[in-house]
Amino acid sequence: MKQRFVLDTTALTDLQTREMLEIEDLCQGMRAILDLIAESRLHLQISCYVPFPSVYKELHEFAKNNGCDDEIIAMIDTWLVKKTPDRHEVKIPSHIFHEYVSYMRERINKGMTVAEEAIREASIQCLSIESEIEDTRKVEDNTDREVIGPIVGKFRNKYRSALRYGILDSAPDIDVLLLAKELDAAVVASDYGIQKWAEQLGVRFVPANTFPMMLKEYLRHTPSDGTHQK
């Protein structure tokens, strides 16, 4: 059976993947992966899809915002098959939605706990500063500079970790899973949320940092005449 993969944006932009390929530049990393996809398409009839327009648009914007040249854009358009997932016909078991709602509730509660801890920490710090400085204006300035800023930064990181880790938090994430389910394809991503729910849906998952090596291994076993074995 012909191999099919559905790519998340992270399939082309993942830092760990570039490190494994020993490439520092993001655009060159994207080029290297797209070259492997092109060779696999020509020699092995492996097809790599991206949901349209969600992930396709993300890839275009990511490439342009990071200064990638027009050749990278052309490679995206040429070697990645654009397809809109059939959101009406793809059937997902109801227990998946039930579990997802429960999981989201748990994450929201964890996020609330992080927020409460940040508020308590800020209050304690403010009171300790206020007890040492009588000038209200100085208290406000010192609080903003020494307390609120660092705590808000720490709070944001903790909140993202508590609330977003392991969830599907964007339309492109959902589109990737729906399209993979529709095509009976494997998902390629470095997003734990996509991985977790791919497993729930019975969709094969390929980590982004192993995908290029997988393609290289396929190509290494391609007969020298360029044909593929069936």
UniProtKB/Swiss-Prot annotation:
GO terms for biological process: tRNA 5'-leader removal. InterPro entries: RNA_free_RNase_P. GO terms for molecular function: ribonuclease P activity. It comes from the Archaea. The keyword Nuclease applies. It catalyses: Endonucleolytic cleavage of RNA, removing 5'-extranucleotides from tRNA precursor. Keywords: Endonuclease, Hydrolase, Nuclease, tRNA processing. Its EC number is 3.1.26.5. Belongs to the HARP family. RNA-free RNase P that catalyzes the removal of the 5'-leader sequence from pre-tRNA to produce the mature 5'-terminus. This is RNA-free ribonuclease P. It comes from Methanococcoides burtonii (strain DSM 6242 / NBRC 107633 / OCM 468 / ACE-M). The lineage of its organism: Archaea, Methanobacteriati, Methanobacteriota, Stenosarchaea group, Methanomicrobia.
